Amino acid sequence: MMNKLGLIIVSVILALIQTGCAEQSTWMSLNSSNPRIIWEVKPQADLENITGEQISTPEFKMSDYVKGVVPGTVFTAYVEAGIVPDPNYADNIYKVDETFYNRPFWYRTEFELPSSYSEGKRVWLHFDNTNRFADFYFNGEKISGTKTSTKDVSGHMLRSKFDVTNLIKKSGKNVIAVLITDADQKKTRKAKDPYGVACSPSYLAGAGWDWMPYVPGRLAGITGNAYLVVTGDVVMEDPWVRSELPTLQKAELSVSTDIRNASSSPKEVVVSGVIQPGNISFSKDIRVEGGTTARLSINKDDIAQLVVDHPRLWWPNGYGDPNLYTCKLTCSVDGKVSDVKEMTFGIKKYEYKMVDNVVGYPVLTFFINGQKIYLKGGNWGMSEYLLRCQGKEYETKIRLHKEMNYNMIRLWTGCVTDDEFYDYCDKYGIMVWNDFWLYVAYNDVAQPEAFKANALDKVRRLRNHPSIAIWCGANETHPAPDLDNYLREMIAKEDNNDRMYKSCSNQDGLSGSGWWGNQPPRHHFETSGSNLAFNTPAYPYGIDYGLSLIHI
């Protein structure tokens, strides 16, 4: 049996570096799970007149800090430190002074470059999610926005990526400081805005909901993975494998990726890839000017192998196996590997048709791979109300949905930003009705441009997941016309309309609004849903629906 010291050594190695042969880029976790990383958290007010440039230097010492949790929230850090009584017990969470947490906080950590780093390589600092606003500093310099700007990164789904090559120290301590600012809306539990919707894009339920308490700080923090990647000058961004299915016996694949040249000189780049199973190999050359990004696309006209005979199709739970493929992409310059990306995807085809139900009313019906699907599922409100659900815990929760014979989860207001949620939905054949972050009072969205930027990042980040079955604009309402039009046009471009965009979760033919409108079972078979009076089409299954116990 491995002793404790051995386990620690292995954990350090795995957390610090993931390498493989000469082709793999160096990757280093900056999460709290890395035993060499300690995040320090402290209110900005306690560091008055001290700048981010000062905090992000080795000479600065942050005293009386709370140990941060990354990914996580400011409030969670105080809970884990034992400063706040267990908020799950009794009414403890209602006794917390929310004003202490509803203000800006500093995060700070130090690290050293891994020994595998070699001179001349490009170093990138990544943050997958920060809520609600973030300003970033590195080794004494502000790296986000401008020197005079604040709240540079706006929204909980927006990825941040910084080229820190010229600031990184090859030996000795490197320092990161992040100023996290909470949302501007609903600063107290009793604020007039009942749901704090105007803070979108954010975790809306953090401001309190009819099924969830108000969370002090409203889930502000570094809520996604933080990590360092070392590459060459040329990197790939947002790679995408798209599948078309003319017949069940033949699939046509296309591969695209943005190629970013971070150097000042032009580069001749070779992008090669391998898709498994099937050992489908391909490559294509592209010239990328210095300091620019170019789009590379490869399809069946370039590579005949991208036409796949007898593909292994992805099916939802109960209709077949949720088969998955992997695609490993490598970009090289002058025969040397500059970047490597690997993604998982599924070959499938979603269709949405108006089909008459048993009493002759047309209802919108889901098909996948030509097969009509009877949807079974429910709402997913929050993975955990303090964002403490991570990693393998998602597998347990998604697997249980499969074992309940569900095949769909409605992701209420897009409340999950963790990639693992979608990974396990892919694995277990659970389709996702994927909302954006809007609710009823759509005109109150304070920053529509931030909303659009987050929405674009969401689609690019998630579109490889075969489990995503539909994009939905808003919960129980329509987005404002400007946002609605943007979402529709953006999804048509970025996801090629492979999945439907639906404006509203419970109107325009949808058949229910959860336990607000319980119906007897016969309602689902004899009528077209809650819009019967207007003779408008409805779904055969109301994704918000519940059945009252007296009817079961």
Task: Write out the residue ranges for each language-model feature.
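Bacterial N-terminal signal peptides
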Residues: 8-17
